[in-house]
Amino acid sequence: VVLKDMTQEAAEKGKAYSEPLLKKLVSRGKMLQSDSEKILNRITATSSDTDLQGCDLIIEAVFENLDLKHTITKNTESYLSNDGIWGSNTSTLPISELANAASKPDKFIGIHFFSPVDKMPLVEIIVGEKTDEETLAKAFDYAQQIRKTPIVVNDSLGFFTSRTFGTYLDEGLHLLVEGYNPIQIDNMGKAIGMPVGPLQVGDEVSLELTRKAQETWADMGVADKWSDGSVTRRVIKDMITDNGLSLIHISEPTRHVD
């Protein structure tokens, strides 16, 4: 596995994230120390694109910016093996538009992981207009090999999960600005069967990622296409100005749910 980042320091930090996860497995008797060391030794941290030469799968995972993702695709797609495929870990951007930057759009597919990746089993696989069946099969097989649960969806802005959770977050923030207790808002979300509340979703996804996605949607002329994100944008603007506090601790409630 090649882990490539902007700097060597950032790449090493990414590799180091795996160490405590493996140590926990060893301490619980679920993995031998020797196997843990073998896994870490398989990860090559680098800041050089050339180390990607010959990869069977490259997964790009930068933030939600169409131009940036296009640039990365153009600069590094050529390092794939002859039968290699390109995966974009995008949560919102249409795969068919991202694939416009690829020389082989039939080998381009969305592979959307969820945070924290080591705990969340779901992987959303998004098929673009030109994605061929072999690429879909490889992406699906890869997800199963790493013990994830893949779901296959067609290409659309936000796909299935981001459209659902985006609306969920929007509604939670509407309640927040109306003065409801943040803890009660999240408890209401869990009461209807969601694993976490909408404000916790916002915190875990991060306001910065949501902000960048909102900006990209506005640039594409599709902001508020499936829900009213005006309140979300206002809250994010205020929160980032206010040093990035947690949504759950944003303010004192003025209203309560009976």
Give the role of each language-model region.
Residues 1-251, 255:
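N-terminal glycine-rich phosphate-binding loop for ADP-containing cofactors
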